[in-house]
Regions:
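Basic polycationic patches enriched in arginine
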Residues: 2-3, 28
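Sec-dependent N-terminal signal peptides
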Residues: 3-12
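Sequence signature of WD/YWTD-type beta-propeller architectures
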Residues: 17-228
Length: 228
């Protein structure tokens, strides 16, 4: 999951809610151009986050904001922040508790979703062992919906285990995500309110990281198929 340690912008493309810690910013410095003289593909390549690991950034439907996960200080593990697409100050959107991942705007940009472990435990889960290479932790994530400022937090999934990697259909706002509720990591789809849950894949191995096509008639996703 954490394939990028910096977020880059291509300028030519376009229950009770827990208390939050004070809002902080991960943009510690002015956006700066990172294109080298040898660059042939990107017209304007800028670094817009500074400090910590910043990843899984997604555009608002209006193209004016980015939502992403970050572990810059003072966070002990990933939290969700939002910032203007031009790299302005970022604001904490998640609860500041547990670990979060995979945030996304809902259609209309008035609400967002993300996965979090904060109801399982307010503490950061133990990181996976990376001594033998990259390993994505299958923590006790559930998927939550909130207003775009992080208020009015509602839980959409409640099955034991891993529910995360959610993205949104731009047509009807339905959500596709990865879950291990069936005993394997499969793709599931639900309505924007968490209802009408149905399983989309049923093949041994990992299925995740799914995205809808623009008209939501197709999906693309990552898959691994163990042999033997």
């Amino acid at each position: 999951m954490r394939r990028l340690l910096l977020i880059w912008v291509i300028a030519s493309c376009c229950p009770a809610e827990p208390a939050k810690p004070a809002a902080t910013t991960s943009a510690r410095g002015e956006p700066r151009n990172q294109a080298t003289p040898e660059e042939r593909h990107f017209k304007d390549l800028k670094q817009i986050t500074f400090g910590g690991d910043n990843a899984e950034a997604y555009w608002s439907f209006g193209g004016d904001r980015l939502i992403f996960q970050t572990n810059h200080k003072p966070y002990k593990c990933d939290q969700i922040e939002m910032m203007p697409a031009n790299g302005g100050p970022a604001k904490l959107i998640s609860t500041g508790k547990g670990r979060t991942t995979c945030s996304y705007f809902l259609k209309g940009d008035q609400e967002i979703i993300y996965a979090s472990t904060h109801e399982s435990s307010p503490e950061c889960p133990t990181p996976p062992d990376m001594s033998k290479g990259y390993n994505w932790g299958l923590f006790e994530y559930d998927i939550y919906k909130a207003n775009a400022d992080g208020s009015n937090l509602r839980k959409l999934t409640g099955a034991p285990g891993y529910d995360a990697e959610a993205t949104v259909c731009p047509v009807d706002g339905s959500i596709i995500f990865t879950s291990e509720r069936s005993g394997d990591l499969e793709l599931w789809r639900m309505d924007a309110n968490g209802g009408n849950l149905r399983q989309l894949t049923n093949t041994p191995g990992y299925d995740g990281g799914a995205f809808f096509s623009q008209d939501c008639t197709k999906i693309v996703w990552r898959a691994s198929r163990p042999q033997g």
